[in-house]
């Protein structure tokens, strides 16, 4: 079982993409939440025109750009290990069953959900849900939506742990 929030979700996706041919990891499932999947796009450009007019969202996106620059460093941002949305279907088809949660009030929402859809199209069993009232980091910061998400985590992990023990 693998799990990651935000950049950690990106790392989980990268590990699974890298492992698509070798199959050394063999996780029973993966939990990925509100994570960046396309680091080729400037976060400010991801904002809708309405959000681009809102100083709060622009500042958040500018901060996200700083994080992205630190995270990507000298790597090619189009590399699927950096931008999982760019992975080929064969790599995505090797993913285990996934629970993917997006935050309704997060600039990464659209990308996270697009990645979930790519996995579904690759034949992966995916449970994806947008937590409407949630902001980025809601599960770790215990902000609106975190309790519901925690229940989803527990249910998902229990199902897979029981399957592994059967």
Annotate each language-model stretch with its function.
Residues 1-166:
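Alpha/beta-hydrolase superfamily serine-hydrolase fold, recognizing
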């Amino acid at each position: 079982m693998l799990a990651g929030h935000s950049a950690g979700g990106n790392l989980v996706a990268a590990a699974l993409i890298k492992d698509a041919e070798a199959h050394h990891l063999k996780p029973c499932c993966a939990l990925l939440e509100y994570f960046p999947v396309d680091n080729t796009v400037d976060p400010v450009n991801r904002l809708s025109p309405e959000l681009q007019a809102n100083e709060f969202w622009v500042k958040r996106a500018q901060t996200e750009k700083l994080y992205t620059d630190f995270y990507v460093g000298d790597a090619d941002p189009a590399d699927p290990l950096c931008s999982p949305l760019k992975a080929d279907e064969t790599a995505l088809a090797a993913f285990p069953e996934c629970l993917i949660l997006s935050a309704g009030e997060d600039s990464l929402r659209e990308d996270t959900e697009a990645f979930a859809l790519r996995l579904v199209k690759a034949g992966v069993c995916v449970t994806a849900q947008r937590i409407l009232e949630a902001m980025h980091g809601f599960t770790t910061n215990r902000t609106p939506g975190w309790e519901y998400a925690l229940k989803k985590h527990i249910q998902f992990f229990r199902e897979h742990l029981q399957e592994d023990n059967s």
